[in-house]
C-alpha cells in the first residue's frame, strides 16, 4: 500500500521511430561503425587488443560518448503526446510524425502484454518550412447507444510554426485545418467535461485552447466535436463514393490579445469562475478606486494564467458575454494517401471548380480575425525569472510552474499567490495525480465520534504533485499543499513525463457516469528500456505525518515482511515478535493484509501459523463487539477452521493403519457384481491396456503423493457462509488436494470412515468430496492398475460418501436419474484415463445397485421373507433408469478402452523415413470426445493412428479377413500367406492384427472397411497437403481410395479430394508448364506449385490415378446401392460434425466427359514431367473449347470439343505422342540393352510406373490421332533399341502391316550398313563386293547413327528380315530388296557358323 511505479506497456520497435525522425543518427551510427575499423568484421583476432594501453588517444572515446548521448536523449527533442485512454501516442519532430497504436502481443517469455507499434508515419507539413510545435491526442466519445461514454476514435491536433492548427485521424488523414493567427503556435491544451464535486462549483465547458506569442484562442468543445465528426464522416463517404457535397459546421472560437506582458511561453486555461461578493468588491476597488460601481450579481469570468517574463506569471480574466464568439471558415482537406478521385470529390465539398482554381485557393491564406485586447490584471513580478511551463491541477485549484532557475513553484489559482517552492529541479517536467478515498479503508473507531452515527460522508480527494528531474534521473511524488515527499524512484535521465490533463471529449453529466475507461493520469516514457510506466499513489499517503496511524501500520507491515524473510533458528522468538506486530496494527484492512502474508509464508511451520491465528482470534473476541471489524473476525475464524481441518487430516494420514484382509479374484467379482467370465474379460482388457499404454512419467524423489504444504492448502480452500468451497484452481492442484484427502485411504493406509467423518464435519459437501475422489482416482491410473486392492477401498469410500446427507436425494426413485450418480458418470465420460474410468464405473455401478436394491427391499419387505430378501439382494438387481445408464456407460468405456489400446500400440516397423507429421503424438481418447466427434469420430481416430504407423491398406484388409473367416484354424494360414504380399517393413506387426480384429468386432459399423479406408484416404491427403514434399502420403491416399469397394463412397471421396486439395495445384502446374514450354525446374515448381519437381511428378501421376478412379466409379455406381451408414447401439447419442463418408454420399454425379478431358490433360502433364520433355506447351494441344473447360467443377456440364479437329492440332498431338513413346522406350531400355522378357515396367520412386505405350495409344484415341501410327512407332522404337522379342509381340497389334514392314526394312538396312560399312573388316568388304549393286547403293544411303543399339546379333537381324518379308506382299516395290537382304544376312552369318 505504498507509492509504486508500474510498467503497463512496451514499445514494439521504438528504434524504427527514432530512425525515421532522426535519420542522421542512423547514418552517424553506421558511418561511425565503418570509420572505427573496417577490418573488425573480418579480423577478429585484433579486435580490442591494445585497449588497455595508456597512450591511447581519448578523442574517439569522447566522440562515441556524444553519439551515445544523442542516441538515448533524442526523445527530449521531440513533441510527444499520449491519449488519456492509451489508444494512441504521437511522436513528432520538425515536419515528420509517427503515430503509435497499442496491440496485445506475446513477449519473448510467452506472456501477453500490450505493445505500442507504428500505426502510421509520414510528413505533416503542408507549407514549406513549417514545423510541428505542439500536439494533442483527444479521444472523442461515441454516440452509439451500445457504447455510450466510450471512446469512438482519437483525433490528433497538431500546431505548426506557420500558425496553422490541423486535425488528423489515427491513420494520418487530414480532416481540418485552421489558421486563426499568423504567429507560430506555442502550445495546445484541452479541457474536457468533469462532473462538479460540490453543488457550488461552476460547471466547466469543454474547450481547446491555442497559445500564440501574443494571443490565446479558445475553441468551444461542442462546436469542435461536431465539426470533427462531420469532417470524418465526409472523408469516409468521399472515399466510398466521391459524390458528397456537405459543408461541415464552422467552429466557434474566441481570440484574446494578451497585453502588458513581455514574453509568453506556456499557459493554463482555468475556466469559468464566479467571484464571491467580497472578492468582487476588492477587485472593483483595485481597478476603479473607492468610487467604483458594483453590480448586483458577480460577473462570470474566464481565467487564464500565463508563464514567461515580465511578469513571470500573469493572471488574465475575460468577462463572459463581453465579446461575441467568432465563426471560422473550415478549411477541409484530406491526406495524400487518398486517391485522386477523392481529391476531386473534396474539391466539390469546398466549391472548387478546376485544378488551377484549386491551387489558387490553397495558396491564398484564409482571413485572420483580429484579437480582442485583454490586459493582465496582476501577476508575480520577477524580472530575472523566466517561466518555462505551467501545469494545472485536476480540480483547478492549484498550478505548478517551472522556471529557468531550477525551481518548481506551487500557485494558489484562486488567490493568485505562490504557496510553496522546491529547489534543485532544473529542466523539470511536472504532472498531477488525483486519488479518491476508499470509504472501506477508514478507521472504524472514528465513526463513533460522528454525530450522524455510522455515516462516513463522501469520499475525500487528495492531489499529489509528480516532479521528474531529468538531470538527476529521479521521479518524485509530493503531497500538496504542504505535505511531505511520499515516493521517489530512479528512472533514468532520458525519460519524458506525460500529463494529458483531460479525458474524453463529447461527454456530459449523463454519459460521463455510464462507463469509465481505464486511464492513466501520469505516464513516463523511457526510450532506453522501451517501456511506458505509470505511478500508483494510495490515498492514505495524503494523511501521512508523524501522528498518522496508517503510516505506523505500514511501517509495521514492512517490518513484518522483513521478519518473515529472515532465517532464524529460534522459531518461538519469531512467533512472539509476529504476534506483537500483528496486534499492534490498528487498521482492520492492514491487519487482514498482515495475516494473509503470515499464512502465505513458507518458512513458518504449521504450529506457528495456528498459534498466531488463534492469538489474533482471542484478542478480537475479547474486545467490545462494536469496535471489532466483522470482516476481520470472520476471516480469522475461517482461517482457523481450515488450519484445524489440515491438522486433523494430517493426523489421520500419519497413523499406522493397514488393511490386512486378503483379497482374491472371487472377492473382486462379488464386489463388482460380475461373473467369472466377465471378470476374466475385464482383466484381459486391462492387461492389454497396461501393456500398450505404459507411459514413462518423470518423478522426483521428493515427490510424495498425499502430502500438501499448509500454505498451499490454505490457498486452495475458502469458507463462505460456513460452507467450505474450493477456489478456482488448476487440474493438477485439484488432484493434489484430493490426494491429500484420499490417497492414503485408497491404499488402505488410512481409516476411510474417520476421513469421511472429518471432511463432512468441516463443511465439505458430498458432491465436492466425490469430485475430489474421482479426480485422484482417474489421474493416478498407473498406480491403481498395479494395485487391484485399491478397488475395494474405492468401493468403501464411495459407499460412505453415498450415505452422507444430501448425497442422494431422498425423493429419488427408480424412474428418474440421480444427480449423484450422474456426477460420477460425467467424470468417467470426460476422463482420458480409460482404464481407471472403467474400474470406477464398475465400482459406481455396484454401489448404485446395492443402494437401489436396499431401497427396493425396504419397499417390499412386508411381502418378502427374511431369507428371500437376502437372495433378492445378492442375485437380483432392481431395475432403474440409473442402472440402464450405468450399463450404457460400461459398454462405452469398454469400447473406448479397446480403441485407446489400439491407438497406443506400435508395430516394429523399420521405415526408412519418418515424417515430422507422423511423429506428432496422438491425443488421448475419452467417451466425451467420441460422443462429440460425430459419426466418423471413431474411424477418424483410427485413421490418424494408421497414418502415424504408415500401414499399407493390406494390413486393414487382412485383419478384416480374419474377422470374416468361418474356420478359426484356416485364417491363420491364409493370413500368414497374405502377409507375404505386405512389404518387409511391415512384417513384424506384433499384436496389432489381434487388436485391429478386436476393434472391428467392437465397432462393426463405425470401422466398416469402406468407412475406414475413406477416413484413411482423407487423413493421408490432409497430411500431404500440409507438406506436399511428402509425395508418398498422396500415393498412399490413392491406395486407400482404390480399396474402397462401394462406388458411391469412392466417387464422393475422390471428388472431395479433387475440389479441396488438388485442382488449385493442378491448375498452377498446368499454367507453369505451358508458360515455360517444358518440364519446369525445381525452383519454379516450388514457387508456383509449392513443391519440388520430383514431388510434382508424383503428384501428377497420383492425380491421373484419381481421375481414372473417378471415371471407373461413375460407371459402376449405378450397379451398386447406396450404403446405409449404421451406428452401434452404445453410440447412438453421438453428436458433432458430419462424417467424411456422409459428405461423400452427398456429392453430385460427375460429368464423365469433363473428367475424361481432365484425365487427358493430366496424362500429358505427367508425361512431360516423367520424361523431362522439352518444347511442349500442353495447352497448345487443345482448342479454345478445350482450354475453357479445364479446371471447372467436375459435376458441371461444359462445352467440350466435338467433331473433326483442325489438322494442325492433330499434327502437333501426333508429334507429342510419338515423342512420349520414344522417351518411354528410351527410359525403359537405354540402361540395359537387352531386357528379360518377363520383367515388368520399371518402378518409380513412388510406386510402379505407367504402361506408357498403352497410355499413348489410349491418348491417341481421345486426341483423334491415328492409333496405328503410334503402335507402328512403338514397334520401330523397340527394334531401334534392339528389343526385337518385344517388337515381335507389339507387331500383332498393328493393323497396317505393309507400312510397318517398309519402316522395319529401313531399320534392317541401317543395321546391315553398320555391320558392313562402319566396321570395315576384310570379310565385310569382300561380302560387300559380292552384293548386288542395287542393294549396295541402298545400304550406302542408310544412316546407322539413328540406331540406338548397334550391338544386335546378326541372327536376330535375320529374323527381322524374315519378318519383313512375311509382312510385305510379293507385289510390293521393296519385296525384291528384302529378298536381297536375306541373301546378305545369310552370307554374313556363314563365317560365324
Curated annotation (Swiss-Prot):
Gene Ontology biological process: establishment of protein localization to endoplasmic reticulum membrane; intracellular protein transport; macroautophagy; positive regulation of autophagosome assembly; positive regulation of endoplasmic reticulum tubular network organization; positive regulation of protein lipidation; regulation of GTPase activity; synaptic signaling
Phosphoserine: residues carrying this PTM: 39, 450, 916, 978
Tissue expression from the record: Ubiquitous.
Domain of life according to the entry: Eukaryota
Keywords assigned: Cataract, Cytoplasm, Disease variant, Endoplasmic reticulum, GTPase activation, Intellectual disability, Phosphoprotein
CC annotations in GO: autophagosome; cytosol; endoplasmic reticulum membrane; plasma membrane; presynaptic membrane; protein-containing complex
Region called Disordered, residue ranges: 36-67
Alphabetized Pfam families for the sequence: RAB3GAP2_C, RAB3GAP2_N
Subcellular location: Cytoplasm; Endoplasmic reticulum
Role description: Regulatory subunit of the Rab3 GTPase-activating (Rab3GAP) complex composed of RAB3GAP1 and RAB3GAP2, which has GTPase-activating protein (GAP) activity towards various Rab3 subfamily members (RAB3A, RAB3B, RAB3C and RAB3D), RAB5A and RAB43, and guanine nucleotide exchange factor (GEF) activity towards RAB18. As part of the Rab3GAP complex, acts as a GAP for Rab3 proteins by converting active RAB3-GTP to the inactive form RAB3-GDP. Rab3 proteins are involved in regulated exocytosis of neurotransmitters and hormones.
Quaternary structure (record): The Rab3 GTPase-activating complex is a heterodimer composed of RAB3GAP1 and RAB3GAP2. The Rab3 GTPase-activating complex interacts with DMXL2. Interacts with LMAN1.
Disease tied to this entry: Martsolf syndrome 1: An autosomal recessive disease characterized by congenital cataracts, intellectual disability, and hypogonadism.
Name of this chain's protein: Rab3 GTPase-activating protein non-catalytic subunit
Native species: Homo sapiens (Human)
Amino acid at each position: 500500500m505504498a507509492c509504486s511505479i508500474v510498467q503497463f506497456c512496451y514499445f514494439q520497435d521504438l528504434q524504427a521511430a527514432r530512425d525515421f525522425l532522426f535519420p542522421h543518427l542512423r547514418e552517424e551510427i553506421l558511418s561511425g561503425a565503418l570509420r572505427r575499423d573496417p577490418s573488425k568484421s573480418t579480423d577478429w583476432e585484433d579486435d580490442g587488443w591494445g585497449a588497455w594501453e595508456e597512450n591511447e588517444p581519448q578523442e574517439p572515446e569522447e566522440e562515441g560518448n556524444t553519439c551515445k548521448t544523442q542516441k538515448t536523449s533524442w526523445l527530449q527533442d521531440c513533441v510527444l503526446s499520449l491519449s488519456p485512454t492509451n489508444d494512441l501516442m504521437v511522436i513528432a519532430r520538425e515536419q515528420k510524425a509517427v503515430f503509435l497504436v497499442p496491440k496485445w502481443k506475446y513477449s519473448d517469455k510467452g506472456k501477453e502484454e500490450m505493445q505500442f507499434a507504428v500505426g502510421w508515419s509520414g510528413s505533416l507539413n503542408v507549407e514549406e518550412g513549417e514545423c510541428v510545435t505542439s500536439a494533442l491526442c483527444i479521444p472523442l466519445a461515441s454516440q452509439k447507444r451500445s457504447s455510450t461514454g466510450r471512446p469512438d476514435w482519437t483525433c490528433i491536433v497538431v500546431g505548426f510554426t506557420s500558425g496553422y492548427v490541423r486535425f488528423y485521424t489515427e491513420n494520418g488523414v487530414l480532416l481540418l485545418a485552421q489558421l486563426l493567427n499568423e504567429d507560430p503556435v506555442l502550445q495546445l491544451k484541452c479541457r474536457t467535461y468533469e462532473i462538479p464535486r460540490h453543488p457550488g462549483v461552476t460547471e466547466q465547458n469543454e474547450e481547446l485552447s491555442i497559445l500564440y506569442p501574443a494571443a490565446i484562442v479558445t475553441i468551444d468543445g461542442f462546436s469542435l466535436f461536431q465539426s470533427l465528426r462531420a469532417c470524418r464522416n465526409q472523408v469516409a463517404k468521399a472515399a466510398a463514393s466521391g459524390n458528397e457535397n456537405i459543408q461541415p459546421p464552422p467552429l466557434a472560437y474566441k481570440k484574446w490579445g494578451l497585453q502588458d506582458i513581455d514574453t509568453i511561453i506556456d499557459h493554463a486555461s482555468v475556466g469559468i469562475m464566479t467571484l464571491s461578493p467580497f472578492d468582487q468588491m476588492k477587485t472593483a476597488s483595485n481597478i476603479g478606486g473607492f468610487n467604483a460601481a458594483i453590480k448586483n450579481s458577480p460577473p462570470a469570468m474566464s481565467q487564464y494564467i500565463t508563464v514567461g517574463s515580465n511578469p513571470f506569471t500573469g493572471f488574465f480574466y475575460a468577462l463572459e458575454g463581453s465579446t461575441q464568439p467568432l465563426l471560422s471558415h473550415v478549411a477541409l482537406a484530406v491526406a495524400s494517401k487518398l486517391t485522386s478521385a477523392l481529391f476531386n470529390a473534396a474539391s466539390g465539398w469546398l466549391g472548387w471548380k478546376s485544378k488551377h482554381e484549386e491551387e489558387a485557393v490553397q495558396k491564398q491564406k484564409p482571413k485572420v480575425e483580429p484579437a480582442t485586447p485583454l490586459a493582465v490584471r496582476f501577476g508575480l513580478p520577477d524580472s530575472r525569472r523566466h517561466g518555462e511551463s505551467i501545469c494545472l491541477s485536476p480540480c483547478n485549484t492549484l498550478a505548478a510552474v517551472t522556471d529557468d532557475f531550477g525551481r518548481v513553484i506551487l500557485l494558489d489559482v484562486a488567490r493568485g499567490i505562490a504557496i510553496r517552492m522546491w529547489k534543485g529541479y532544473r529542466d523539470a517536467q511536472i504532472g498531477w495525480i488525483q486519488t479518491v478515498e476508499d470509504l472501506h479503508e477508514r478507521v472504524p473507531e472514528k465513526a463513533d465520534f460522528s454525530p450522524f452515527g455510522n455515516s462516513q460522508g463522501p469520499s475525500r480527494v487528495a492531489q499529489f504533485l509528480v516532479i521528474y528531474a531529468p538531470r538527476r534521473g529521479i521521479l518524485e511524488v509530493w503531497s500538496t499543499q504542504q505535505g511531505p515527499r511520499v515516493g521517489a524512484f530512479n528512472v533514468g535521465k532520458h525519460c519524458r513525463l506525460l500529463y494529458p490533463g483531460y479525458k474524453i471529449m463529447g461527454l456530459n453529466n449523463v454519459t460521463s457516469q455510464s462507463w469509465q475507461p481505464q486511464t492513466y493520469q501520469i505516464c513516463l516514457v523511457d526510450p532506453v528500456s522501451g517501456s511506458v510506466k505509470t505511478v500508483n499513489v494510495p490515498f492514505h499517503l495524503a494523511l501521512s505525518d508523524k501522528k498518522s496511524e496508517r503510516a505506523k501500520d505500514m511501517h509495521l507491515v514492512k517490518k513484518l515482511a522483513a521478519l518473515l524473510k529472515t532465517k532464524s533458528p529460534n522459531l518461538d522468538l519469531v512467533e512472539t515478535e509476529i504476534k506483537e506486530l500483528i496486534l499492534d496494527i490498528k487498521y482492520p484492512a492492514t491487519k487482514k493484509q498482515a495475516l494473509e502474508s503470515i499464512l502465505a509464508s513458507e518458512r513458518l511451520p504449521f504450529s506457528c501459523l495456528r498459534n498466531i491465528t488463534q492469538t489474533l482470534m482471542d484478542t478480537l473476541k475479547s474486545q467490545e463487539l462494536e469496535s471489532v471489524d466483522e470482516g476481520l473476525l470472520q476471516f480469522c475464524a475461517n482461517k482457523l477452521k481450515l488450519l484445524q481441518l489440515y491438522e486433523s487430516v494430517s493426523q489421520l494420514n500419519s497413523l499406522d493403519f493397514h488393511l490386512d484382509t486378503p483379497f482374491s479374484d472371487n472377492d473382486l467379482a462379488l464386489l463388482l457384481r460380475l461373473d467369472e467370465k466377465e471378470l476374466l474379460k475385464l482383466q484381459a482388457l486391462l492387461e492389454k491396456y497396461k501393456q500398450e499404454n505404459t507411459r514413462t512419467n518423470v518423478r522426483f524423489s521428493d515427490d510424495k503423493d498425499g502430502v500438501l504444504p499448509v500454505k498451499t492448502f490454505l490457498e486452495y480452500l475458502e469458507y463462505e457462509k460456513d460452507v467450505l468451497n474450493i477456489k478456482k484452481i488448476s487440474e493438477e492442484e485439484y488432484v493434489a488436494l484430493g490426494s491429500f484427502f484420499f490417497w492414503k485411504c485408497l491404499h488402505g493406509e488410512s481409516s476411510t470412515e474417520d476421513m469421511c467423518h472429518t471432511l463432512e464435519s468441516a463443511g465439505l459437501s458430498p458432491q465436492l468430496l466425490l469430485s475430489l475422489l474421482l479426480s485422484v482416482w482417474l489421474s493416478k491410473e498407473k498406480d491403481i492398475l498395479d494395485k487391484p486392492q485399491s478397488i475395494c477401498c474405492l468401493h468403501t469410500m464411495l459407499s460412505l460418501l453415498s450415505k452422507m446427507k444430501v448425497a442422494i436425494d431422498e425423493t429419488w426413485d427408480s424412474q428418474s436419474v440421480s444427480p449423484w450418480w450422474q456426477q460420477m458418470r460425467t467424470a468417467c465420460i470426460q476422463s482420458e484415463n480409460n482404464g481407471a474410468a472403467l474400474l470406477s464405473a464398475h465400482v459406481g455401478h455396484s454401489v448404485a445397485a446395492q443402494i437401489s436394491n436396499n431401497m427396493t427391499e425396504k419397499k417390499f419387505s412386508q411381502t418378502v421373507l427374511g431369507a428371500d430378501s437376502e437372495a433378492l439382494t445378492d442375485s437380483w438387481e432392481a431395475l432403474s433408469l440409473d442402472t440402464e445408464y450405468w450399463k450404457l456407460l460400461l459398454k462405452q468405456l469398454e469400447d473406448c478402452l479397446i480403441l485407446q489400446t489400439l491407438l497406443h500400440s506400435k508395430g516394429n516397423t523399420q521405415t526408412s523415413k519418418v515424417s515430422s507429421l507422423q511423429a506428432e503424438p496422438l491425443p488421448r481418447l475419452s467417451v466425451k470426445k467420441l460422443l462429440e466427434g460425430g459419426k466418423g469420430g471413431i474411424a477418424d481416430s483410427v485413421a490418424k493412428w494408421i497414418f502415424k504407423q504408415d500401414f499399407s491398406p493390406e494390413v486393414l484388409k487382412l485383419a478384416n479377413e480374419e474377422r470374416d473367416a468361418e474356420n478359426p484354424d484356416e485364417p491363420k494360414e491364409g493370413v500368414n500367406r497374405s502377409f507375404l504380399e505386405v512389404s518387409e517393413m511391415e512384417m513384424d506387426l506384433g499384436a496389432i492384427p489381434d487388436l485391429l480384429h478386436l476393434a472391428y468386432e467392437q465397432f462393426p459399423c463405425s470401422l466398416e472397411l469402406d468407412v475406414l479406408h475413406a477416413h484413411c484416404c482423407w487423413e493421408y491427403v490432409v497430411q500431404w497437403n500440409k507438406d506436399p514434399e511428402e509425395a508418398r502420403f498422396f500415393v498412399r491416399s490413392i491406395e486407400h481410395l482404390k480399396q474402397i469397394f462401394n462406388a458411391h463412397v469412392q466417387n464422393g471421396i475422390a471428388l472431395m479430394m479433387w475440389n479441396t486439395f488438388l485442382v488449385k495445384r493442378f491448375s498452377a502446374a498446368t499454367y507453369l508448364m505451358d508458360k515455360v514450354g517444358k518440364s519446369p525446374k525445381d525452383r519454379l515448381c516450388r514457387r508456383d506449385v509449392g513443391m519440388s519437381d520430383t514431388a510434382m511428378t508424383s503428384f501428377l501421376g497420383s492425380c491421373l490415378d484419381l481421375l481414372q478412379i473417378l471415371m471407373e466409379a461413375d460407371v459402376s455406381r449405378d450397379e451398386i446401392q447406396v450404403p446405409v451408414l449404421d451406428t452401434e447401439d452404445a453410440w447412438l447419442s453421438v453428436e458433432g460434425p458430419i462424417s467424411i463418408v456422409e459428405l461423400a454420399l452427398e456429392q453430385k454425379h460427375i460429368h464423365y466427359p469433363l473428367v475424361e478431358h481432365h484425365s487427358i490433360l493430366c496424362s500429358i502433364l505427367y508425361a512431360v514431367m516423367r520424361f523431362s520433355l522439352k518444347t511442349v506447351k500442353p495447352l497448345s494441344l487443345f482448342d479454345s473449347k478445350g482450354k475453357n473447360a479445364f479446371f471447372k467443377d467436375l459435376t458441371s456440364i461444359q462445352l467440350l470439343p466435338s467433331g473433326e479437329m483442325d489438322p494442325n492440332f492433330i499434327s502437333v498431338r501426333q508429334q507429342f505422342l510419338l515423342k512420349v513413346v520414344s522417351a518411354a522406350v528410351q527410359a525403359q531400355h537405354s540402361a540395359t540393352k537387352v531386357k528379360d522378357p518377363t520383367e515388368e515396367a520399371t518402378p518409380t520412386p513412388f510406386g510402379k510406373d505407367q504402361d506408357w505405350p498403352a497410355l499413348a495409344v489410349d491418348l491417341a484415341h481421345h486426341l483423334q490421332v491415328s492409333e496405328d501410327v503410334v503402335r507402328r512407332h512403338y514397334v520401330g522404337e523397340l527394334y531401334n533399341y534392339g528389343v526385337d522379342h518385344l517388337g515381335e509381340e507389339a507387331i500383332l497389334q498393328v493393323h497396317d502391316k505393309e507400312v510397318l514392314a517398309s519402316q522395319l526394312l529401313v531399320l534392317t538396312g541401317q543395321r546391315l550398313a553398320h555391320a558392313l560399312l562402319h566396321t570395315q573388316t576384310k570379310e565385310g568388304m569382300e561380302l560387300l563386293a559380292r552384293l548386288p549393286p542395287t542393294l549396295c547403293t541402298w545400304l550406302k544411303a542408310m544412316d546407322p547413327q539413328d540406331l540406338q543399339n548397334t550391338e544386335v546379333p546378326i541372327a536376330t537381324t535375320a529374323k527381322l528380315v524374315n519378318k519383313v518379308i512375311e509382312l510385305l506382299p510379293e507385289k510390293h516395290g521393296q519385296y525384291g530388296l528384302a529378298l536381297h537382304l536375306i541373301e546378305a544376312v545369310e552370307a554374313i552369318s556363314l563365317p560365324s557358323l
